[in-house]
């Protein structure tokens, strides 16, 4: 069971860019992608990615559990959820801009990051620039990478 926070973030980013003149970006839900895939597609091209994992890469903890009013579905919260900005990688680590506890830019071992990202349902959002001649159409796939 999961709540799609990344969709809410993506929708809000899209609404914001559509209301401001001369800003031509699109929020892309990249949930389900590994950190490695996100680095290859975006970060290696200078575009950071909003990324969910666990705070300080702590172990995820299950609970509490409740029933969602609208659907009746049972929802289980995964504690230690944390969102940060994936900004880089080297052979051993992924690097994040993380304001938590004054971290600034911090690196974590790749295997640990992938595990904690998986624990939070591999949620991620990218913000991509749309090519000028496609701004009004806003077609998927017209972003610059």
Q: Where in this protein do the model-derived segments appear?
A:
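Cysteine-nucleophile protease catalytic domains, especially the papain-like/related folds used
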Residues: 1-48, 121-145
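Noncatalytic regulatory segments and standalone regulatory/sensor domains
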Residues: 44, 57-59, 63-78, 83-145
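Structural recognition of the beta-strand scaffold that forms the well-ordered cores
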Residues: 24-27, 49-53, 85, 95-97
């Amino acid at each position: 069971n999961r709540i799609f926070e990344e969709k809410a973030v993506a929708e809000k980013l899209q609404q914001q860019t559509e209301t401001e003149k001369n800003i031509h970006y699109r929020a892309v839900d990249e949930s389900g992608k590994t950190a490695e895939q996100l680095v290859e597609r975006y970060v290696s091209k200078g575009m950071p990615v909003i990324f969910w994992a666990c705070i300080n890469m702590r172990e995820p903890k299950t609970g509490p559990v409740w029933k969602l009013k609208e659907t009746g579905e049972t929802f289980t919260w995964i504690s230690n959820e944390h969102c940060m900005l994936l900004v880089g990688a080297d052979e051993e680590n992924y690097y994040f801009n993380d304001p938590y506890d004054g971290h600034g830019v911090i690196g974590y071992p790749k295997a640990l990051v992938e595990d904690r990202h998986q624990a939070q349902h591999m949620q991620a959002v990218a913000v991509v620039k749309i090519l000028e001649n496609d701004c009004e159409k806003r077609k998927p796939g017209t972003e610059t990478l």
